[in-house]
Amino acid sequence: MSQSHEALILIQKMVKVPPTKALLLFNTATYQGLQHTSHSISFILNHLLSSGMLPQAQSLILRLISGRIPSSLMLQLTQAHFTPCLTYTPLYDTIVNAYVHSHSTDQALTFLHHMIHEGHVPLSNTFNNLMCLLIRSNYFDKAWWIFNELKSKVVLDAYSFGIMIKGCCEAGYFVKGFRLLAMLEEFGLSPNVVIYTTLIDGCCKYGNVMLAKNLFCKMDRLGLVPNPHTYSVLMNGFFKQGLQREGFQMYENMKRSGIVPNAYAYNCLISEYCNGGMVDKAFKVFAEMREKGIACGVMTYNILIGGLCRGKKFGEAVKLVHKVNKVGLSPNIVTYNILINGFCDVGKMDTAVRLFNQLKSSGLSPTLVTYNTLIAGYSKVENLAGALDLVKEMEERCIAPSKVTYTILIDAFARLNYTEKACEMHSLMEKSGLVPDVYTYSVLIHGLCVHGNMKEASKLFKSLGEMHLQPNSVIYNTMIHGYCKEGSSYRALRLLNEMVHSGMVPNVASFCSTIGLLCRDEKWKEAELLLGQMINSGLKPSVSLYKMVHKVKEILGFHGMKPKEMRS
């Protein structure tokens, strides 16, 4: 008996029984090796869908997608000439949902487009699930296009808009996000706390904390009650912008409103105290957190360990790591990276390397951050052989050196006057497909200037324009200082004026060195003009420069300038 005939007999049996029994017959035939036809599969899907058995239909489709049930149905459904007797909308809806659940973005889109082409529209739940998948998969532009194409056809709800607003905020498209907020109201829907919290969080992450504050106030006018996450993201936003008073006030407002701070809120507070060097206050908040019964995760401990390391309290930091183990948590790679960074900062490379070996033996894998931290540590203590050994090891672990890795090495070789080696690292960086940035060039130029190689430094400086890179204030000040050391007052003054015309303010050292060199070269008028420029920039001349200027004024015959003017 042929497979198609067996499938036909199966259909005749399934049509006589309820869908649950029909599915059992279908599965039994599958396990016995029956090669289903598109008609037998279409029948059981239609039988399940028409009875409202969506989960069972979706499970069956997932088996088709994975190949556990061999069939050409999925391919045939996308062919225009294939028209089986099915309830199309539920079928396509279920297929799209199945692909979404299996994270098959392209296939989900294929069936969605075919569904629309056939004149069918997905249900709200399917549409929302697909939008979520697209945004999580970094396909925001596709999600935006589909949303606008179907917004007048699909029954949208507040969740639909919330998904898209979150996508806008994550992609930095705030104009679109606020346009969606207005559109939501045009559709007769009311924005909820989650939508406003999403917008507040987005504004804070992109530095517009005042707009976030306005949204928070608008929530109050609308009668929306902020949740712990709303307070936390705004509090964190204030802290990130250096607005400590506002951040702490937000924390107090949260408690006054009767809302118990969550772990995120406490972590923000602890982090702010640690960043400000107030580790004792951070530990008081930590104690309060535990008293309130809020679970302290590894992240909380990592923040405190980082604060202790920045305060050079390494003994306490190590004790806290041991405490992490005692409370049933495990130090993660971030914990080790913080400790390694702390010990590298103070040149304790033996301890840093011991921690590095410890993390590997505990089953953790070093990250690019781990290697860069250790390479920077070795470079700081001038152990370039150790740094290069680590580069070799990271490559063996299939971790490619990054722009930061190469910049650290270039800086180290240039500072130690290994110019050829620094240039070799620069060349390797470009060969690996990485594009050096202004900071990379600044460390190379700095190394050349420090060792008096102004000819090469000047060539590199001029090449920045050819690469469409704008020199920053660090590069200008470095070059000016280099020319002053060389005794070239003309070049130093020219660069200083160029820097000012570019909208940058030279630092005190650049002004002082150039004025001193001009005086040495008896270019009194230029020195006096530059001094006036320095004072007008809001910079204070040093005592030695003050005395030098008096000498300049005596030579020029100008005795009218008051000491007060010099000290302003």
Predicted regions mapped to residue ranges:
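Pentatricopeptide repeat
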Residues: Q3-A7, A22, T37, I41, ...
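Inter-helix linker motif
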Residues: G33, R68, P84, G119, ...
